Amino acid sequence: MRKVFQFFFTVYGFLIFLFLMVILLPCFIYAFLQKPVKGGNMIYKISRWLANVFFFMTVIRHQNIYEELHDKTKEYIFVSNHISYLDIPMMMKVIRGQNVRILGKVEMNKIPIFGAIYKRGTVSVDRTNAKERSKSINELICFIHKKISVFICPEG
């Protein structure tokens, strides 16, 4: 019985995600048409709203518990494990009021429509090519110099 519930809940969550993506597509397109930094920041603001609505509609609750509050006026390198599809939406809920870029795998850029949004909002890394990995690190450093925090998931 539990497996059946998990299956239907997964399908429900996926349909909610698709519905929200379709509703927000004009906002993502507008953000995509902006300059790279401004457009990327807009994508994260839209994604934070999407995460709030998604978690509300799927009745998933969370509570932020900080060992120490960080200064939102400074840039940081956030590091986390990434083992679930919910990790990134949860990260959207945790890192608030601060611009951020995620280091993400280049393979995600190939997904129709989502890939274009993903590419604008992340720093893509081709893990099979040492030169491209180095280029991605340099791009992250540039974002830090622009006062934008970065988020990496070394195990994801």
Give a label for each model feature:
Residues 2-64, 116-120:
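A transmembrane-helix-recognition feature enriched in membrane-embedded lipid enzymes
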Residues 57, 61-156:
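Soluble catalytic domains of membrane acyltransferases
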